[in-house]
Amino acid sequence: MSGFNWDDENINHIARHGVTPEEIEEVFNGDPEYAFSYTKDGEERYQAFGVTARGRYLTIGYVERDELIRAITAWDMTRRERKVYDAKKIDRQK
C-alpha cells in the first residue's frame, strides 16, 4: 500500500469513536497485526490491530482501493481483541 484515502465520510466516522486519521496512520506505519478478512458488498474488507505512538491500542476496519488504505471504522481494542493481539505478537517473536 502506498498511502491512505481520507475524506469527510471516513474521517467523521472514526471521529465518532474518538479516533483520528493520524492515529490510524501511526498503526499502519508501525507493526500492525492483521486479524482476518471478509467480503461485504462485493468488496474484500480487512481488520488490523495495532498501537499508536502514544500507546493506544486500536482495532481498524479497512479496505484497499487503488493501492491506498481506506479506513472504514476504528475503535479502542476490547479486552478480547487485546488478548488476541498480544498472543499474535508473542507468537511472532518466537
Model-derived features: positions:
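Ribonuclease/tRNase effector modules and their secretory precursors
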Residues: 1-94
